[in-house]
């Protein structure tokens, strides 16, 4: 219900959404849609997702008070159907697990992973870049409060 992002990987359709319409509580399901049976299977929770190769990358950012956040990262192998609860980010700065993650993108040319964090009115957001293997590379300002999209040339 209430989809936010749809991605096709290996002829499979993945839908990340809110799971409900306001004012009902959001459940943020990430679902695999079966085009033949027109059914969905929930593979986990997520507020952002991206894909590269055979992998679906998912970030799930949760909060109870809109001040303190907890973010987890996982992958889903689109060929085997296996979900790995282990974060795909190595040596990630603490801000990525305690901040409000607003962006998750993968560069289609080299697999580099970009994660954006917003601080809302407190200042510009930050973008964290990781190599395709999850190794941390750098942090840079997003140029605005809520980094929510990347364009790769």
Model-derived segments and spans:
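A short beta-strand motif characteristic of beta-propeller blades
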Residues: 1, 35-45, 82-96, 135-141
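Solenoidal tandem-repeat scaffolds enriched in leucines and small polar residues
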Residues: 1-31
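Repeated scaffold domains used in trafficking and secretory/extracellular systems
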Residues: 1-9, 43-55, 59, 96-106, ...
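Residue position within the beta-strands of beta-propeller blades
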Residues: 14-16, 57-60, 115
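Residue-level signature of beta-propeller blades and closely related beta-rich strand-turn architectures
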Residues: 19-20, 62, 119
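Structural motif
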Residues: 22-31, 65-75, 122-128
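Long, well-ordered mid-to-C-terminal structural blocks that present hydrophobic/aromatic surfaces
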Residues: 23-64
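C-terminal structured domain segments
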Residues: 95-134
């Amino acid at each position: 219900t209430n989809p936010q992002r749809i991605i096709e990987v290996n002829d499979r359709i993945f839908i990340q959404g809110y799971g409900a319409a306001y004012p009902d509580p959001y459940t943020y399901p990430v679902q695999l849609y079966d085009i033949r049976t027109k059914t969905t299977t929930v593979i986990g929770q997520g507020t952002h997702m991206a894909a590269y190769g055979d992998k679906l990358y998912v970030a799930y950012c949760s909060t109870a008070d809109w001040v303190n956040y907890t973010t987890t990262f996982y992958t889903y192998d689109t060929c085997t159907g296996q979900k790995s609860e282990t974060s795909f980010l190595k040596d990630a700065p603490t801000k990525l697990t305690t901040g409000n993650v607003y962006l998750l993108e993968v560069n289609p040319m080299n697999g580099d992973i970009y994660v954006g964090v917003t601080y809302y009115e407190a200042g510009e957001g930050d973008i964290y870049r990781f190599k395709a293997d999850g190794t941390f590379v750098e942090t840079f300002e997003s140029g605005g409060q809520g980094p929510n999209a990347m364009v790769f040339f």
